[in-house]
A protein has these predicted regions:
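Acyl-donor (CoA/ACP) binding surface of acyl/acetyltransferases
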Residues: 1-24, 28-35, 70-192
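Conserved GNAT-fold acetyl-CoA-binding loop/helix
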Residues: 37-57
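A short helix-loop-beta-strand connector motif used in the catalytic cores of GNAT acetyltransferases and
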Residues: 44-45, 57-72
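Short, charged low-complexity intrinsically disordered segments located at boundaries
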Residues: 51-62, 86-90, 151
């Protein structure tokens, strides 16, 4: 199924990532390196690649083969972060993973929970997936608060799951199924 995308709630919007977004991604990521460093994946075999143009190009390639849905998070019309639905599997697995980052300039404004809820609802209602998983470092209190607010359930720990900040790091696993939010995650979040 080809993805078409433009979702909005209040001041928060999700849209497909565009090639030209690499400049804004680069500006945010490099300006706030210390903010992102504890959570960003690193290369276990060498230096980190800060070629944001190539990263966006690769994300758009994955969009083309429908294995990922790279989205820009906008707040009041400005690019402030990215949310990616990745490892999209249809058929008997019918699952995907969500990862996200947001500029520290707007962190704490409730943008990320709304963005995750919008993306989750789209994947459940439009794409027809059954399960969404979010993996988070246990030390990432802000991200843990996002899944807590949205009602994702804790399922366990993946030991040494992703190479981050020069070491293999454990991640806590959180998931939600479509049956748990029959009226939509955003509606449930706003109601709670």
């Amino acid at each position: 199924m080809p993805f078409t995308f433009a979702l909005t709630h209040s001041d928060v919007s999700l849209r497909l990532l565009r090639m030209r977004d690499w400049k804004r991604i680069e500006a945010i990521q490099l300006e706030h390196r210390d903010w992102f460093r504890p959570w960003e994946a690193t290369n276990p075999g060498g230096p980190m690649n800060f070629d944001f143009r190539s990263l966006v190009r690769n994300s758009l390639r994955q969009l083309g083969d429908e294995s990922a849905l790279p989205l820009a998070i906008e707040y009041q019309g400005q690019f402030v972060g990215q949310l990616t639905v990745s490892n999209i599997l249809n058929g008997s697995a019918s699952t995907a993973f969500i990862g996200y980052w947001i500029s520290p300039e707007v962190a704490g404004k409730g943008i990320t929970p709304i963005a995750v809820a919008l993306a989750t609802d789209y994947m459940f209602k439009v794409v027809g997936l059954h399960r969404i998983e979010i993996d988070i470092r246990p030390e990432n209190k802000a991200s843990l608060r996002v899944v807590e607010k949205l009602g994702f359930r804790f399922e366990g720990t993946k030991k040494g799951f992703i190479h981050i900040n020069n070491a293999w790091r454990d991640h806590s696993v959180f998931a939600l199924t479509a049956e748990e939010v029959p009226n939509g995650l955003l509606k449930k979040f706003l109601k709670d």
